[in-house]
Every structure is written in C-alpha cells, then in structure tokens.
Amino acid sequence: MHAEAPESLKVSLEEISKPEKEKELKEFALKVFDWNKTTNLVSKNSTLENIYNHIIDSAHLYPYIQDNSYIDVGSGAGFPGLVISILGNKDGCLLEPANKKASFLRHCLAHFGIQNTKVLQKRLEHLDLIKEDVLISRAFAEPKKIQSLAIKKMSGDQKILLMVSEQQAIREDKNDWKYIPSAASKILGKKTGFLEFNPSKK
C-alpha cells in the first residue's frame, strides 16, 4: 500500500501551485487508509484510490480559501479541512464531535506539525459564534440545514463554501447559493463544485 501517489494528485497540486505538498498528502492518505481499518473515518470499503480522490476534491477548494481563517463542519477524516491545513493554511478549526475521528485529526495535526489548526469537539448547533472567515463542509448535511444553523452565528463579511456534486447544486435555490464548478471535475471524471453563500449580502 506504499505505492507512488497517483498522477492525478500530482496534476492537482500543480494546478493549485502546491507540488511540494505531494509527500505529506501521500502520508495523509496512508494514515486515513490504515486508521479506517479500525476506526470508521470514511466508508468501510474505501480503497486507497477512493481516499486520494477525496484529497484531490478537497485540494481544489484551497484556492478559494488561501490564508483566510476557516471552520470545517463535520470534519470527519479531515476532508476538506485537514487537507487545506496541510496545503498551508495557518488558521483553521476542525469541528468534529466524534471521539475517534477527533483523535485521528489531532494525531495528524501533531504528525504534520500543524500548530495553528485546532480540533473542536462540538456540534455546529452548540457553537455560540462563528468567528472564522469561511465555513466549509463536505457531506455533513443538506446545504439548507447548514445555512439555517450557521447564519445565526455569523456576522460581518463571512461566507459558507460547501463541497457538492453538480446534481446537489441543481436542487438548491439559486437566489441563495452561487455554484462554482471545481477544477477537480476533469481530473476525477465527475462533476463537482462548491456552493457559496454570503450571509452579509442577504
């Protein structure tokens, strides 16, 4: 299981100008794969290829965040939040209530020497205030549910960015959400993107 990282990862990292992060993301993929044997991080039958695809999908969110602070709701195995931090973001919060998943996230932060990203074991509905610039999430809940929970806790020029399939995006209200196609689509062979919502503009 210690084969070279797939060419698709290399292409993705070149596209977002982060080719130097290939080694770390390969290590991360292997950690997810190994821990998943005993901890339910991702789908039980996930292959290493599946995990690399999650990483590639997450990596293409990075250009929309850069150095803005973020909170990843339902971080789970670290998609997309931990990937964003490995790529170089210095101000993140991984929101994950489950003990085993939170332990995995803390292990990875320590392993990769990421000091300014924290793990918070809470649910979104139990937060008093969201201070980060961007709320991100992947496969946590329906966009409308996340929107209704988060909007009460946000103020100022903040935004929500959710990783979705094109089919998910079609179902959402275009007056609320802006759909941004992901550059990962052509690499993964499926149409994915991001739903963007800015509460201050409503």
For the regions a protein language model found, what residue spans apply to each?
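Class I SAM-dependent transferase core
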Residues: 2-67, 71, 100-117
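Alpha-helix termini
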Residues: 53, 87-91, 146
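Conserved SAM-binding loop of SAM-dependent methyltransferases across substrates and taxa
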Residues: 77-89
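S-adenosylmethionine
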Residues: 81-83, 93, 97-202
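Conserved beta-strand/loop positions that form the S-adenosyl-L-methionine
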Residues: 73-75
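Flexible, active-site-adjacent loop/turn segments at secondary-structure boundaries
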Residues: 39-40, 49, 77, 122, ...
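Nucleotide donor/acceptor-binding cores
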Residues: 67-69, 90, 133
